[in-house]
């Protein structure tokens, strides 16, 4: 199964919007070069499906974490519902490993309190860089 990387963002400062990139270098066991989250943890990169992003944009009441979740990679065409921890992805010349699926909802979120199933909770994926490489907008992303 294959999808496409539709957007790349680097976040250099807390609370600031991300910088849209045409390409980025991903460093093995670190994350995206220059990103404030590139610290070698289990959440080196964040991925968001286009479906989840589209759903977020049409909500009358934004979820509590809509502004908090910062996606490094936005994709189309790859069913994120098929992703599980341990699954490997090829993105550009980099290899990624899924470390966590399904972001946990925060207490106090209007969507959660109103019983609305948030697509960010299932469409937000955390990744680790397994092999360094370059990714570009328009590159394919596929499950290995």
Where are these regions (language model features)?
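Metal-cofactor-dependent catalytic cores
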Residues: 1-144
């Amino acid at each position: 199964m294959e999808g496409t990387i539709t957007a790349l963002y680097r976040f250099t400062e807390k609370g600031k919007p991300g910088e849209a990139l045409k390409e980025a270098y991903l460093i093995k066991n670190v994350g995206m070069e220059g990103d404030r989250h590139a610290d070698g943890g289990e959440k080196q990169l964040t991925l968001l499906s286009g479906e989840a992003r589209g759903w977020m944009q049409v909500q009358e009441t934004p979820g509590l974490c809509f502004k908090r979740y910062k996606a490094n990679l936005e994709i189309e065409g790859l069913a994120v519902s098929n992703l599980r921890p341990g699954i490997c992805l090829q993105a550009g010349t980099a290899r990624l490993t899924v470390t966590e699926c399904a972001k946990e909802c925060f207490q106090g979120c209007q969507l959660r309190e109103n019983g609305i199933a948030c697509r960010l909770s299932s469409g937000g994926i955390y990744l680790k860089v397994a092999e360094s490489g370059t990714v570009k907008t328009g590159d394919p992303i596929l499950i290995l």
